[in-house]
């Protein structure tokens, strides 16, 4: 998943 995502 994208960085900073849960």
Curated annotation (Swiss-Prot):
GO terms for cellular component: extracellular region. GO terms for biological process: defense response to bacterium. The keyword Heme does not apply. It is found in: Secreted. It comes from the Eukaryota. Keywords: Antibiotic, Antimicrobial, Secreted. Has antibacterial activity against the Gram-positive bacterium B.flexus and the Gram-negative bacteria E.coli and V.harveyi along with two other Vibrio species. This is Antimicrobial protein 2. The lineage of its organism: Eukaryota, Metazoa, Ecdysozoa, Arthropoda, Crustacea.
């Amino acid at each position: 998943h994208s960085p900073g995502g849960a």
